[in-house]
Amino acid sequence: MKKLMLICAPVTSRSGYGDHARDLVRAFLKHDKFDIKIWDVNWGQTPRNALDGELDKNIIDCILPEPKMDSRPDVYVDIRIPNEFQTLGKINIGITAGIETTAVSSNWIDNCNKMDLVIVPSEHSKDGFVKALYEKMQQLPNGQQQKVGELKLEKPIEVLFEGTDENVYKPIDNSSLNLVDDIKEDFAFLHVGLWGAGNYGEDRKDIAKLVKIFYESFANKKEQPALILKSNQATFSILDRE
């Protein structure tokens, strides 16, 4: 009998975490070592229609109609940000993209320490967790704070790079791209990312500042490159597009 694995992830979401989750689920299914059940969760307000009824039937068949199990999973895999990690299995694995900066919050470190293993996609992300260090403080009766220890990552963390489907992502004939005719520059930078909420400088990807710095950096260059932004907002709605 196969061991029971419960995967908590936004597998139906059209998002980066959704793509990552689907890649991992397909890999688990291909190895065929576990009886896999999926707890599909939302990812913000992104659409939850990423699965194809025919092509992704093996994934859809694993999705639980309700987030409950008759028995405790042998392995629980949580593919989200660390503050959402739970420990529902006999063995608990947290898989996260981490953070774009070097500052990992104490809340994330605390939750990672509840897992048996943490997996991230890059050495940069791993370094952020490994090097994070916070002082544990205790409130004294006189109102002062006293250091009682340190908070740091104490559980194993491994890097599992995000692979590429070469059937999809491959060199193509530039003549098949209508966009090429609109780009007069010889060199172009491409940025792909969700343009989040907030005013200038508040978007987590900081795309507005990217545009500003791009203009400033190449303003006085004789041969200026192009900047291509492939972006979207969370809800994909007509109102957002307008």
For each feature predicted by the language model, list its residue ranges.
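Conserved catalytic-core segment of nucleotide-activated headgroup transferases in glycan assembly
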Residues: 20-22, 26-27, 164-242
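Short beta-strand segments
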Residues: 6-9, 37-40, 77-80, 161, ...
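Donor nucleotide-sugar binding/catalytic pocket of nucleotide-sugar-dependent glycosyltransferases
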Residues: 117-171, 178
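Short, solvent-exposed loop/turn segments at secondary-structure junctions
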Residues: 11-14, 25, 41-46, 81-85, ...
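Nucleotide donor/acceptor-binding cores
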Residues: 2-3, 90, 187, 225
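Extended catalytic core of nucleotide-activated donor transferases of GT-like folds
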Residues: 6-8, 45-129
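N-terminal pre-catalytic "stem/leader" segment of glycosyltransferase-like enzymes
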Residues: 1-72, 215, 226
